[in-house]
Amino acid sequence: GEDDRAAWLLGLLAETWAAFDVTFRSLWPNRVDPRVFTDGVLEDFIAKVALDGIGFGAAEAMRRIVGLAKTADIETLEPHLREGAARGVLRASRMMATTRHADTSASGIAQRAGEILLATRTR
């Protein structure tokens, strides 16, 4: 129901990841032992954090729809809107969980999730 807010929230994904990436990389030169934690370790670690973050985000979004701790953003919608929103979150979460190894870019994930949410919304 709130397309502008949804676009803003999806945009936060790329903003948050970019802030983490820049901050972590700026702190990397101060690591404990550069002989053990090489620059190759940095790239591998950031890639793993991205994969884990996408998987966790997908699981958390599913849990907030199916589990006991429902999200007020969806629960307070009118019933006809709630159904489409919940379906969209579940489908976007499934996409994130199943395709996270193919593309870990925050902007790519946000774009695909946005397309799914638009396709499943009800009016």
Predicted feature locations:
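Active-site activation/catalytic loop segments of kinase-like enzymes and analogous catalytic loops
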Residues: 1-31, 57-73
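ATP/Mg2+ or Mg2+-diphosphate-binding catalytic cores
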Residues: 10, 40-123
